[in-house]
Amino acid sequence: MHKNFFHNVKVYYEDTDAGGVVYYANYLKYLERARTEALSTIGLSNIQIKDKFGALIIVKSCNIEYKNSAHLEDELTIRSFIKSVTKTSFFMSQIITKGENVIVESQIHLVFVNDKAKPVKVPQIIFDNFKPYFCDSIKI
């Protein structure tokens, strides 16, 4: 059974529109924060990946479906898990919930690239540390 990464956020006034509803683009910020915290959970940061491996993790594509709205002062949980891995990328699913209610479902394709934006192999330490969070397939 795979593990999940969890990250909690609180909705602040700056996150909302005039009606007190989270502005749609801000969910992408929440998802990015959760991915950054997932790296931290396995003992790495984006800066370390750049310094140690000369690589950056970029978003190649993002599919997001808005199921419900979040509002000012809501407490949200972002659950993230790895769907599949290739030599140079991985696919992550992320779900934002408020209690039992799903607010957002997303599928993110992340690619490791060098400083010239060319794909590079996922560093072995990242692959190994993410392994408990894989839920579907590995294509190496």
Residue positions per predicted region:
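Terminal targeting signals and extreme-terminal segments of soluble enzymes
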Residues: M1-T77, V85-I140
